[in-house]
UniProtKB/Swiss-Prot annotation:
Record GO cellular component, one term: membrane
Catalytically driven reaction(s): a UDP-3-O-[(3R)-3-hydroxyacyl]-alpha-D-glucosamine + a (3R)-hydroxyacyl-[ACP] = a UDP-2-N,3-O-bis[(3R)-3-hydroxyacyl]-alpha-D-glucosamine + holo-[ACP] + H(+)
One term of GO molecular function: N-acyltransferase activity
EC nos: 2.3.1.191
Active site feature: 246 (proton acceptor)
GN (gene name): lpxD
Gene3D superfamilies with a match to the protein in the record: Hexapeptide repeat proteins, MurE/MurF, N-terminal domain
Gene Ontology BP term (one): lipid A biosynthetic process
Family recorded in the similarity comment: Belongs to the transferase hexapeptide repeat family. LpxD subfamily.
HAMAP family, alphabetized: LpxD
InterPro entries linked: Hexapep, LpxD, Trimer_LpxA-like_sf, UDP_GlcNAc_AcTrfase_non-rep
NCBIfam families, sorted: lipid_A_lpxD (TIGR01853), PRK00892.1 (NF002060)
This protein's name: UDP-3-O-acylglucosamine N-acyltransferase
């Protein structure tokens, strides 16, 4: 594909062809800036990575709106396009070269489908899929091999269920959702009542709702509650190996990284970001636009827009100051001991 074809399809107006229309190389693929070879398109996200322009073997670059970087690329004969959001444009460009596998609609003969299930149009149901009573599947849904769908589940249009995921009873999956392999949606919440003779099992009669455009990573689990619902909001993206307990309410547009765990009844507002291995205690709330850095332990509510770190969670700026002091503790301790010894000597005079 010619570079000119790429900028046309991406609808980019600021690019090197306006200055040198004859330099229009063939681009055959995409690559990271430090791995790119001739005929590759790559990107640089900001001025602090400008040194890569002198080192890369890429034939084309997506650059920020920085004239110095554009001139540097031009001097090396690298064609470029510019945008306020290079990473976003790079993501859009990938789709010009790669499309994920999409099977042709069919129902495989080994699939087991209960006669009361309702299947929409243009649906793919792969080998050894099990669909139980009362299930409703929308149009254009893709269900890869070995998926198990429990009774009375609803799956919205164009959603994709990858191999070996499980959707348990009465779960509601919205449109354009993607659920990756090994995920379990709607499993029983951890509900046991202590008695004198042991634990009494509380039946989990609730259900899980995934709103439209939710992505669920591999081996993530989202539990249903004893009553009511566990809900994941519109356009929220959840990584691999995340545990979301019974009754959690997750707002729209959140991003949750791997190995995060939420206890029961946690509430996240809109656009909350959780980095890897965050733990959130029972019933804690995080306000709209708040962020928790990696390995944060959240025991209490977090205000809207607040960034927290550490265990127990504290404001991120304070956490950084504590970290700076922590690395100096040995020297500070030695200075303290010296002062203490001097004080002891003076007190003995």
């Amino acid at each position: 594909m010619k570079f000119s074809d790429i900028i046309s399809k991406l609808e980019v107006t600021n690019h090197s062809l306006t200055q040198n229309p004859n330099n229009d190389p063939e681009i055959t693929g995409m690559a990271a800036i430090d791995e790119a070879t001739s005929a590759n398109l790559s990107y640089i996200e900001g001025a602090k990575f400008a040194s890569f322009i002198a080192q890369t073997n890429a034939s084309a670059l997506i650059l920020p709106q920085n004239e110095a970087m554009q001139a540097q690329a031009q001097a090396r004969g690298i064609v470029w396009m510019t945008t306020p959001e290079p990473r976003l444009l790079f993501a859009k460009a990938i789709a010009l070269f790669y499309q994920p596998y999409t099977p042709t609609p069919e129902i495989h003969p080994t699939a087991v489908i209960h006669p009361t299930a309702k299947i929409g149009n243009d649906v793919y149901i792969g080998p050894h899929v099990v669909i139980q009573p009362g299930v409703e599947i929308g149009n254009g849904v893709i269900i890869h091999p070995n998926v198990v769908i429990y009774p009375y589940v609803k799956i919205g249009d164009r959603s994709i269920l990858h191999a070996n995921c499980t959707i348990e009873e009465r779960s509601q999956i919205g449109a354009d959702c993607i659920i990756h392999s090994g995920a379990v949606i709607g499993g029983e919440g951890f509900g046991f009542v202590p008695t004198r003779t042991g634990w009494y099992k509380m039946e989990q009669s609730g259900y899980v709702v995934l709103e439209d455009r939710v992505d669920i990573g591999c081996n993530t689990t989202i539990d249903r509650p004893s009553v009511g619902e566990t809900r994941v909001g519109y356009d929220t993206k959840i990584d691999n190996l995340v545990q979301i307990a019974h009754g959690c309410q997750i707002g729209a547009g959140c991003a949750i990284a791997a190995q995060t765990g939420m206890a029961g009844g946690v509430k996240l507002g809109k656009r909350v970001i959780l980095a890897g291995q965050v733990g959130i205690a029972n019933q804690a709330k995080m306000g709209d636009g708040s962020t928790a850095s990696a390995q944060t332990g959240i025991l209490h509510d977090v205000k809207p827009g607040e960034v927290v770190s550490g265990t127990p969670a504290i404001p991120h700026k304070i956490y950084l100051k504590i970290g700076a002091i922590y690395s100096r503790l040995p020297e500070m301790y030695q200075a303290f001991r010296q002062l203490q010894r001097q004080s002891d000597k003076e007190s003995k005079r």
